[in-house]
Amino acid sequence: MENDKTVQGANQSANMYSYQEDQDQKYQFAQTGAIRRSLGEGNPSAFPENQINNISSMNNERAVGQNSIIIHIDQTPPLYWMFFVIFGIFQVIFIILLGCYYSKDNLINLELDDENGEDINKNGARDEITKNYKIFQEINVMIFLGFGFLRSFLKHHSWTSIAITLMGGIVAFEFGLFTLICWGAIFKRDWNNGIFNFQHFLDANYCAATIVISLGAVLGKLSLPQYLVMIFLETIFSTLNYVLLRQTMKIIDVGGALTVHLFGSIFGGMFSLVSSIMKNERERIRNSPHLGSNYNSNIFALFGTLLLITYFPSFNVSLIKDYSDKFKGVINTYLAILGSIVGSFCFSPFFNKGKIRIKDILNSCFSGGIIVAGSCHIINQLWASIILGVGSAEITTFLCNILSDKLKVYGYHDTSDIIYYHGIPGFLGGIVTTIFVGNLLQDKNETERNNFTDKNVYDYIGTIMNYTFEYNNNTFNSTDLSKYAGIHFSAIFITLAIAIASGFFAGFLIKFCNCNFAIRYFNDSEYFDVTNNESFPWDDELIDVQSNSRIGNGEKN
């Protein structure tokens, strides 16, 4: 049996192998490690044994035809070295910017106590640590541990999911520190004032959370350079949206229902849709044997959900300065999460023949924290928080079970279903905040309400948001508050517009540049050395050379 194949770069260290069929079709696969190759019932003599690390042939049961091969990659393709170079260069640039922008004079308010144990500055390090460090620490647990373990649900992609989440959070945090400064300067809001404190870290953490959420849509489908490009571009646009809404429009969104959850999910979903290449590539994604979870991976993901449930109140109230409002925000967030947990367990069996689907529990249980993220500190009826939590869980569970499979038919694939579990609650959270803005004055007595001016209203809102407003000294009336509620409502669609446009741009850029996508989707062996890991479930993907598509896998796991 002759198959008239030619091999270019035949030595073991070659970076690329090229297969040429009788039909003069060429298919190239990035390669630095071992290849398993089989030609029907034939022998692998087309590749000299001393040039291939590991060669095996298929038996008759696994044979699909004489034009089929199995590609098995053990090591990272050389293209990914570009990622490590870019990553290192970025870190050097960050160090230079940090050294140029922040000097000892900028850090004066962070000096420690003197030798007598007295605080040198009135608002020094002691106050910073007491007020903010605990919440800052809890937010980091939520972002890196909570979302990290939550994204480990893919059975053969857990290592990479956690690593990409960690990398995305770190890059977005560092880059976000300076993009926030740049956008603030463009909008003429000098929010930094040359002083470095925990507030800047908290703002950058919100940026990191946005990027981590977006990465959930494309986990397992991109190469490392593509992940890095996506993170850089989204950081620029997410901080633009953050500064525009919170510092220019002055909306109330302390927990990031719009700036974090809605923006992150829409950007990630649009990026995933646009960056998907040809139809046969979408089929490869949907039919990949690695796409899915198993019992053990879901246990780790459930641990991530528990961490998110535990630390979600800290995330929602981190930007609130008034302690009474912060206390109210914690209570409302926690009650909403309790309601969403109940709603998830009660509603999931309706779509799964009376059985609870673990996917609904993993993601819907914290949807209550998202829907009240913007308004947790202005909700004065505790029962409303529980109702909102139950409703958010039911809506997200319903939409995910109904629409998920239907959207895949049209080419949309979302690895973590972030559109349903972050986007929908975030959108609803924006509407809920708009409604509760109309009740901002109910804590004031009748005399104060009758004598309100614009200054009083904006100062009251400013107390909640910890911002100082510009205002005109006109007599207050209900129309003014309605206008402010209208600004809140418009912020929802401004966020949608920026997220859709920027996600489309980033996805098109990846597609237009024709960057190499992941060779093996949803598989840790794409990036990690697993050759010595006997427990790793090798299941080589079968490729039909004539149709240039993957039609199965060698061994089911």
Regions found by a protein language model. Give the residues of each.
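Residue-identity detector for glycine
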Residues: 9, 33, 40-42
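Hydrophobic alpha-helical transmembrane bundles of multi-pass membrane proteins
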Residues: 35-39, 47-557
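Short linear motifs centered on serine/threonine within intrinsically disordered regions
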Residues: 7, 28, 38-39
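Aromatic (phenylalanine/tyrosine) cluster motif
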Residues: 17-19, 27-29, 47
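Acidic, Ser/Thr-interspersed intrinsically disordered low-complexity regions
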Residues: 19-23, 542
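Extended, low-complexity intrinsically disordered regions enriched in Pro/Ser/Thr
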Residues: 5-6, 10-11, 15-16
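Intrinsically disordered, low-complexity, serine/threonine- and charge-rich segments
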Residues: 24, 29, 33-35, 60
